[in-house]
């Protein structure tokens, strides 16, 4: 009798039990092999505890932790390089949104490998499948969000101008059928999503209709504090339009412009980062922007907007947020913008000091 059978005999005491135990073992292992990898991932409540522990670890070190809600993962940057940058910049957690090629599952895989660094985030809506309203893409997104495995959705593009790393000049109306799927999913599940929409005056109404029609959707409008074309973006020349929207729509949030202070948008030649006051004396947070951050401290978060092509900007982006934005507001406001607001959006819970 082999070791396996002798062991079972030893445990069971009777030969008749050997057969049954062998069948049970074979069945159990067979069942495990049939399960998807993430079926054995930790429960959501346990994952939240892991995230919380990491944030408290950074706090204990004397650094204000940051939760980065907008990272574009393309699979070309070695994950350990990203983690090193996160550590060097006090970024506790990253909402790791994959591109269409990798799919949402990739974020779960990386969370499984590094559960205290990466927040499971669905695919970004910035590729051909999204812009063609691909049914399979939308069905997969729906399945993913409803699975309960993801804490956030990626960034979905509406109007998008060509940028420093791509030439996409596209417009998926915010009130299109594809966006209705995203808004509905957020309304049903409470899972937040990011929206890229150039703030042209004539394009604001399509967004406002959706914010009004889906009051339970959690919408993070990306890159506030930016104006790429003051001719078309007349309302967004100052923070007043932002203040008006925040008052009207309690389900609207913003992440902050990531552009280098003083840099010009290549499409128009205008300085786009209106969040900052730039002078010969240096760079500071604009006075009116400071007022709006302190008036609505619960409505702003930090997103790096880093992708493969902009990876070397990571340190500069985080340093700008820390030295200009977070140091430019009250301590309690800085804490909310840095991590507490993102924490509530992803966990559904207030941060406990």
Question: What kind of feature is each model-predicted range?
Answer:
Residues 46, 52-59, 100-194:
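Active-site gating/metal-coordination segments in enzymes
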Residues 67-71, 94-96, 118-123, 152-154, ...:
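Hydrophobic faces of well-ordered beta-strands that scaffold small-molecule active sites
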Residues 27-36:
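Bacterial N-terminal signal peptides
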Residues 72, 99-100, 123-127, 156-159, ...:
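Active-site beta-loop-alpha junctions enriched in small/polar residues
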Residues 50-54, 77-81, 101-110, 135-141, ...:
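Alpha-helical scaffolding within the catalytic cores
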Residues 43, 47, 169-302:
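Catalytic pocket-lining loop regions of alpha/beta-barrel enzymes
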Residues 69-113:
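N-terminal carbohydrate-binding/catalytic regions of secreted carbohydrate-active enzymes
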Residues 7, 21, 40-65, 80-84, ...:
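Mid-to-C-terminal alpha-helical segments outside catalytic/metal-binding sites
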